[in-house]
Amino acid sequence: AAYVLGLYLAQIKGAMFRDEIQQTLDSLKDMPRKIQWVLDTQTKAVHDAAAQMVDAKSFLFLGRHVGYPVAMEGALKLKEIAYTFTEGFAAGELKHGPIALVDEGEPVVFIVPPARGRNVLHAKVISGIEEVKARGAYIIAVAEENDPDVERYSDVVFWRPACPTLMSPLVDVVPLQLFAMDMAKLKNYDVDKPRNLAKSVTVE
């Protein structure tokens, strides 16, 4: 809904051409197919990673640009339903604090932008992966399929199909939500009734 609202405002303000808006709408309509691709091809990899990481005491999630809110969402879901200490950070802040938390075997999840387009962002995220890998971190990446740099430095990769950068969060959150669900189930927690959470606030 937010995407459609944004396109509507862009049309009213003349910020985008009509064909650009239509192209974006067509891409948006294609997102369910791409999400289904992730469900069909990545579910086992996600479950296997959760089984391997089920005893981990903490996780770091890192992302740049549109990957930052994905990192925050991934960290939040793991915290909410698997009761695992997690923190989400902007990947650009890695050297200003988060890297101090990286110990041998620490799981660090990176949301990797595609190499095409703004490939400077891709290069910076790969550089961050190299840095924490050198300090013994266990790297889990969410990345566009067939990215050789990600394969080279990551221990586990949850692949996504190619999609427009601004819509990639719709796809990237899926394996992270599955990962949190699998972690919770492996710990015998009820994912439908997280403890102590209030989904509404009453002001007295």
Q: Model-derived features: where do they sit?
A:
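A SIS-like phosphosugar-recognition module
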Residues: 1-204
